[in-house]
């Protein structure tokens, strides 16, 4: 997965489950959400989402003892030159897919901004996904926030 300031990162946390089932649930939701914006979004392989034959999302899964976490990216306004520099697959792999460069295989969702208001900005797309993804807002109290900060500090040290 590639990440920069021009993409949206999503973590989907669920009860631990079969890897294929968790991926299926998450990727089906994301694909349906993008289709709901008028995009021709389809799953590709185990963990990618394509629009018009170009990859717009890559995803990975991590299993904890009691949770499954899918982490994904949505390319929104990614710097394609930087992406191409960072991800240099072997020429043979590109040739197998009939393309000359990484740039030919990926797309930013911002290129479709004229199709739907939810694609006009990162904030609008995030709001659209949050409306579809969540059951509501959870407000954390100061003890919960302190615990999260403690856990993240411990994580960052290791």
Where do the PLM segments sit?
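Long, positively charged amphipathic alpha-helical accessory segments at protein N-termini or as interdomain linkers
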Residues: 37-38, 57, 65-158
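Short, amphipathic alpha-helical segments
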Residues: 4, 17-28, 43-44, 65-68, ...
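Active-site cofactor/substrate anionic-group-binding motifs, chiefly glycine-
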Residues: 1
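Generic signature of intrinsically disordered, low-complexity segments enriched in small/polar residues
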Residues: 5, 15, 26-32, 79, ...
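A generic, well-ordered mixed alpha/beta core segment in the N-terminal half of proteins
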Residues: 6-56, 60, 73
């Amino acid at each position: 997965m590639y990440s920069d300031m021009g993409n949206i990162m999503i973590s989907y946390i669920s009860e631990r489950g079969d890897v294929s089932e968790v991926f299926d649930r998450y990727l089906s939701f994301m694909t349906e959400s993008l289709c709901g914006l008028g995009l021709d979004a389809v799953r590709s392989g185990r963990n990618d989402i394509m629009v018009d034959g170009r990859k717009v999302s890559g995803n990975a899964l991590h299993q904890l003892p009691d949770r499954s976490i899918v982490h994904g990216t949505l390319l929104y306004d990614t710097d394609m030159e930087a992406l191409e520099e960072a991800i240099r697959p072997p020429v043979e792999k590109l040739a197998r897919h009939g393309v000359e460069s990484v740039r030919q295989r990926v797309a930013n969702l911002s290129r479709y901004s004229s199709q739907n208001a939810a694609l006009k900005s990162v904030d609008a797309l995030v709001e659209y996904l949050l409306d579809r993804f969540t059951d509501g807002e959870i407000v954390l109290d100061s003890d919960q926030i302190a615990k999260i900060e403690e856990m993240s500090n411990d994580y960052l040290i290791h």
